[in-house]
Amino acid sequence: MQLTAVGLNHQTAPLSIREKLAFAAEHLPDAVHALAHSPAADEAVILSTCNRTELYCVGDTERIIEWLAEYHNLPIEEIRPYLYTLDNNETIRHAFRVACGLDSMVLGEPQILGQIKDAVRIAQEQESINSHLNALFQKTFSVAKEIRTDTAVGENSVSMASASVKMAEQIFPDIADLNVLFIGAGEMIELVATYFAAKNPKLDRKSTRLNSSHLKLS
């Protein structure tokens, strides 16, 4: 058993694959408990966001990949091309980069650090984390705090949610004149809706799926 990470993100996999390998928030506690108490791993933290799914473990890399495929009921050959695997020092460096927002779609975005802290807390509650991963993530949080405090990383950073509003403002003269439809369900779409609501659009609606009625132009 060694320190390892298995994952995929917006750089390695299209949205369709990322969605298949994501862990719903309500299922994450049971999933991380199952992984850490399986033959694949002795310790585990599962980070699952809209742009990445990463399994930080003390375990066997190949068995972790097999567990991931089996958990999501997918052929291992279907997911393997999109995965990256990291060992020991590579895992440590990667955790630092992710926590600092250096591996994010929006450079320096602050939301990811809170998401990692939530993932670690869930793993602790499920008794799925021990000395190795505790040490890794305590150091990760310390490094992220230092980087964000002492460097320009994150100085002008924005979350994906606020970035979507900024992009809309560059395209449309006034968001207050728009009808806005939000498609999806989860933390990110809630944040996007909150940012747009602050701009007082004429109408905002939410839908968990796209259907033909949404495609009609008025």
Enumerate the predicted regions with their spans.
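Single conserved hydrophobic/aromatic residue that forms the stacking wall/gate
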Residues: K206, L210-S218
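Glycine-rich phosphate/diphosphate-binding loop of Rossmann-like nucleotide-binding domains
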Residues: A168-R209
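Alpha-helical elements of the RecA-like P-loop NTPase motor core of helicases
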Residues: E66, G114, E190
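Active-site-adjacent beta-strand anchor residues
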Residues: V58, T85, G154, F182, ...
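Short glycine-/acidic-enriched loop or helix-start segments at secondary-structure transitions
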Residues: Y56, V192, S218
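A glycine-rich (often HGG/GG-containing) alpha/beta subdomain
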Residues: M1-S104
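Glycine/serine-rich phosphate-binding loop and adjoining beta1-alpha1 elements at the start
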Residues: E78-A176
